[in-house]
Amino acid sequence: MKLLWLCNSAPGVIRSHISGKPMSGVNWVDHVLSGLRRQGFTIRVLYRGTGEPGIIDETCSYAAISETPEHIYVPELEEKFREEIRAFQPDVIHSWGVEYHHALAMVNAAEAEGKLSHMVASIQGLCRFLAEHYTDGIPGNVCRKSTLRDFLRKDNILQQQEKFLLRGQLETKALEKLHHVIGRTNWDHGCALSIHPEIAYHFCNETLRESFYEGHWDYQNCKKHSVFASSCAYPIKGFHYLLEAFARVVEAYPDATLAVTGSSFMPTDFKGKLRQSSYEKYLETLAKKYRLEEKLVFLGHLSAEKMKQAYLDANVFVLSSTLENSPNSLGEAMLLGVPSVAADVGGVRDLMKGPSEGFIYKSGDVTALAEQIIHLFAMEEEASRLGEAARNHAQITHDPEQNLRELMKIYEEIR
């Protein structure tokens, strides 16, 4: 079977082929790609990025599409995609996500080439709904402010929200036309049907990064009273809520620390201050208000292996997002058996059953979040029981072989 994939970024195997360097870890899309190639599928991958077209072997070829702002539709892409469809003659077209403008361009191209009934899109994030929760818990005056960086980029919090709304409009147009969609939670199922009641919804869980299928959290080896969050990059991750909750955690556990990936949002150098966004400025204000500056650990950009170690080092993993579908970060924490606390948003309850596998709290309730972190700290070794139950569940949800079988079944149904 011939598959035409549309990806938001280049899979690792393609980056490796272009650079001539070995792959540094296997990400989730590579996991799926390699499985399909082993099963005899021929796959052409189109991805956002740069580089010349290439051929890895008889099972896989690739080409880049230009990176333009996600929220601005590029009509010229339609003709490029039509040419790809005519040249490759795929049995199935698969767009990994509908949250970028190129997904709509592929939908329109498939329709023009008579291939729309043989196209499917996987739901990843849904910008239309993310936009509704983008500013949750952030004061209005903070949302309206602009740092120099925001002013130059036209990218303060409200402007970021507007871009999500625009992406949501393109996403909605794509879903309204599509005949088939792949999802994995009750939440994305409801969202898809609310946009297009007649769409055929296919269930398929996600496979995660390969390295997270090995390793096991151990209370004796973790950093006691430490919390790990996977991102503070933008408001939807809800790190402002976590800072407020963590201030209460520190009252009970003065030695507590909070680690997060990425660079510090509290720059000390002049250039860093010039690059600071209004959301980062707000996080800095909260950190200083609650005197948390010395409690925060910024881990920078992490490889998959280093990210895994950050989970294993933590006493507790926290997902404080204002909205998620099926967050990979929570899935990775569960696969490793890390005791976790998660906001009750989107499809979280499809991933983790509370309280037997971890604790779930109402999004925005910083008191409940703090209490649940404190509770897990106090459980000490006993928290391993929750982590083990979560691990068992995640091994079923993220079973690579089962998920590959489900995906191949979907492809057979719509070819």
Tell me what each language-model feature is.
Residues M1-E52, C60, G114:
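N-terminal subdomain of nucleotide-sugar transferases
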Residues G354-P355, F359-V366, H375-E380:
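Conserved acidic donor-binding segment of nucleotide-sugar-dependent glycosyltransferases
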Residues T322:
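Aromatic "clamp/platform" in nucleotide-sugar-dependent glycosyltransferases that forms part
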Residues G272-H301:
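Nucleotide-activated donor-binding/catalytic signature segment of Leloir-type glycosyltransferases, i.e.
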Residues P339-A342:
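Short hydrophobic beta-strand element within catalytic cores of glycosyltransferases
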Residues L4, D218-K237, L243-R248, L258-T261:
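Conserved donor-binding/catalytic core segment of Leloir-type glycosyltransferases
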Residues H31, C127, C143-H180, G190, ...:
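Membrane-proximal helix-turn-helix segments that form the acceptor-binding/catalytic region
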Residues I85, Q309-A314:
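Short alpha-helical donor nucleotide-sugar binding micro-motif in glycosyltransferases
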